[in-house]
């Protein structure tokens, strides 16, 4: 089993980074990721936790000796389950390969959290992958694991560059996006208040009409009761 670890900083606040994460693919640099399909989304803890399950399709060059040995293709699928926790301000993404998993198993964990040195403006990215090859020939398994670690390192560099490009575009539109969202919220609140006013006015008028109707229908009874008292 081989272990790959990686970490770096993003010069953007956690809110922006985690929002841009859903726009990470496709990008012009991480071309090995060709499709991302959402399988499931679920809100928990009164809307404070978002769980997302995705299927990621990857296409990249594979050495001929691996292709010959495994009899596979250069296309692979990865299952990813992510959890966004607004209370803890954390995004945790866990994934494992579905293709040729009986011969090579890759478990990856990625976390995004506010940077401990500058939580308001920076985000800490941490990545860990456990890579295990299965086979009777230990030397061949080691070679496969070493190649996988090298490929992870290459893809990590591409991923950082690609996500930086996405974040730059996203950041330029972030303020406008927040302003638009705020305007929509204010507009919705105003519409709701107007609806409440209209409903209250209608209810008041209806109550007044009902009161007049009751008086009109029972005027003789009220008159007799008044005369009786006098």
Curated annotation (Swiss-Prot):
The keyword Calcium does not apply. Disruption phenotype: Defects in mitochondrial morphology. PROSITE patterns: PRELI_MSF1. Keywords: Membrane, Mitochondrion, Mitochondrion inner membrane. The keyword Membrane applies. GO terms for cellular component: mitochondrial inner membrane; mitochondrial intermembrane space; mitochondrion. One of its GO terms (molecular function) is phosphatidic acid transfer activity. It is a peripheral membrane protein. GO terms for biological process: cardiolipin metabolic process; cristae formation; negative regulation of phosphatidylcholine biosynthetic process; phosphatidylethanolamine metabolic process; phospholipid transport. InterPro entries: PRELI/MSF1_dom, Slowmo/Ups. Required for mitochondrial cristae morphogenesis and MGM1-processing. Controls the stability of mitochondrial phosphatidylethanolamine (PE). With UPS1, controls the level of cardiolipin in mitochondria. Cardiolipin is a unique phospholipid with four fatty acid chains and is present mainly in the mitochondrial inner membrane where it stabilizes the electron transport chain supercomplex between complexes III and IV through direct interaction of their subunits. Interacts with MDM35. Belongs to the slowmo family. This is Protein UPS2, mitochondrial. The lineage of its organism: Eukaryota, Fungi, Dikarya, Ascomycota, Saccharomycotina.
């Amino acid at each position: 089993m081989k272990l790959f670890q990686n970490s770096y900083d993003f010069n953007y606040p956690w809110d922006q980074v985690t929002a841009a994460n859903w726009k990470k693919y496709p990008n012009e640099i991480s071309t090995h990721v060709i499709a991302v399909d959402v399988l499931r989304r679920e809100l928990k803890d009164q809307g404070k936790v978002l769980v997302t399950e995705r299927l990621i399709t990857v296409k990249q060059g594979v050495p001929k000796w691996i292709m010959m040995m495994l009899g596979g293709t250069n296309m692979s699928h990865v299952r990813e389950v992510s959890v966004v926790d607004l209370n803890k301000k954390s995004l945790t993404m866990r994934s494992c390969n579905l293709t040729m998993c009986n011969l090579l198993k890759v478990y990856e964990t990625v976390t995004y959290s506010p940077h401990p040195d500058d939580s308001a403006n920076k985000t800490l990215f941490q990545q860990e992958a456990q890579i295990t090859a299965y086979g009777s020939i230990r030397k061949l398994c080691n070679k496969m694991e070493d190649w996988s670690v090298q490929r992870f390192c290459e893809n990590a560099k591409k991923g950082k560059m690609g996500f930086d490009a996405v974040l730059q575009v996203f950041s330029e539109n972030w303020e406008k996006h927040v302003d638009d969202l705020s305007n929509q919220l204010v507009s919705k609140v105003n519409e709701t208040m107007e609806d409440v006013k209209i409903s209250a006015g209608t209810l008041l008028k209806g109550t007044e009409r009902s009161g007049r109707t009751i008086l009109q229908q029972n005027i003789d009874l009220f008159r007799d009761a008044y005369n009786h008292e006098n």
